[in-house]
Design a protein with these regions (language model features):
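Conserved alpha-helical substructure of the radical SAM core
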Residues: 5-123
Length: 123
């Protein structure tokens, strides 16, 4: 099985790469987490990246599902004070529970913001 053996030089290069890759994985920091919380929109912009419609035929993700992912998959691995949660879509202001979502994210220690066209703002 001499075909499986590699030379010392290649072995050292692979070990070095492996160490560098592991260090890179350890150093990677999550700074921003985008939640595309709706595909609904009150406009139909041609230039926008998401396929957004007034009624896209897809239900919005329930807040509880997002918070479960945040609690179980994100929070154990980050300092919430160092991560910005960004609500995006579609148009986030079409969600009637957006204020509750923001309050729940804040209660968990995260800062948050949103991407909006602003048409739903009244004050």
């Amino acid at each position: 099985m001499s075909g499986l053996r590699i030379g010392l030089r290649k072995r050292l290069a692979l070990d070095l790469f492996s160490d560098l890759y592991a260090a890179k994985v350890r150093e990677h920091r999550l700074d921003a987490l985008f939640w595309e919380c709706t595909l609904r929109c009150n406009l139909s912009c041609r230039h926008f990246g998401s396929d957004c419609r007034v009624d896209p035929g897809v239900r919005d993700m329930p807040i509880e599902d997002f918070l479960k992912v945040l609690d179980e998959e994100v929070t154990p691995h980050v300092d919430p004070a160092q991560v910005l949660v960004i609500f995006s879509g579609g148009e986030v202001l079409v969600r009637p529970d957006l204020e509750r979502a923001g309050a729940e994210v804040t209660r968990r220690g995260y800062a948050w913001g949103m991407v909006t066209n602003g048409l739903g703002l009244t004050e």
